[in-house]
C-alpha cells in the first residue's frame, strides 16, 4: 500500500461495510439505524472528551484530552508572520497493543 495516495474511507463507507457484515451474519438492520448508532457513538466520544474523561477501548486504544503548552514563536504558514499561541487542549489518541501490531504489519 502506498502512503502517498491513500484511499479515503467515509462514514457512508463504514455504514455500508457494517451493513454488509450484519447481512453476512444473517441479521437485518437498516442503514439508517446503523448511521444513528455511529452518530450516537461519536456524540458520546465528544461529550466524554469535553468532560475530560479518558475513553478506553481495550486492544484498540485510548482517547483523552491533553494540554498543549503555548509558544511565543509560532509561525503562520500562510503569511510567515510570527504569532503567539496560547495554552490549549487537544484530543489525543494512543493506540492499543493490537492496533499497533496490526498497523505495524502494513506494507508500504
Swiss-Prot record:
Sample GO molecular function, one term: structural constituent of chromatin
Any one Gene Ontology cellular component term annotated for this protein: cytosol
Pfam families noted in UniProt: Bac_DNA_binding
Annotated InterPro entries: Hist_DNA-bd, Histone-like_DNA-bd_CS, IHF-like_DNA-bd_dom_sf
GO BP annotations listed: chromosome condensation
Gene3D superfamilies to which the protein is assigned, alphabetical: IHF-like DNA-binding proteins (4.10.520.10)
Keywords, ordered alphabetically: DNA condensation, DNA-binding
Similarity comment: family membership: Belongs to the bacterial histone-like protein family.
Function: Histone-like DNA-binding protein which is capable of wrapping DNA to stabilize it, and thus to prevent its denaturation under extreme environmental conditions.
Name assigned to this protein: DNA-binding protein HBbu
Organism: Borrelia andersonii (Borreliella andersonii)
Amino acid at each position: 500500500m502506498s502512503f502517498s495516495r491513500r484511499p479515503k474511507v467515509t462514514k457512508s463507507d463504514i455504514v455500508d461495510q457494517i451493513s454488509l457484515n450484519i447481512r453476512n451474519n444473517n441479521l437485518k438492520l437498516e442503514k439508517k439505524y446503523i448511521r444513528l448508532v455511529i452518530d450516537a457513538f461519536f456524540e458520546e466520544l465528544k461529550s466524554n472528551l469535553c468532560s475530560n474523561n479518558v475513553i478506553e477501548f481495550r486492544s484498540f486504544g485510548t482517547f483523552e484530552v491533553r494540554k498543549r503548552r503555548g509558544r511565543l514563536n509560532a509561525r503562520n504558514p500562510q503569511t510567515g508572520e510570527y504569532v503567539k499561541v496560547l495554552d490549549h487542549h487537544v484530543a489525543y489518541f494512543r493506540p492499543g497493543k493490537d492496533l499497533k501490531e496490526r498497523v505495524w504489519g502494513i506494507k508500504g
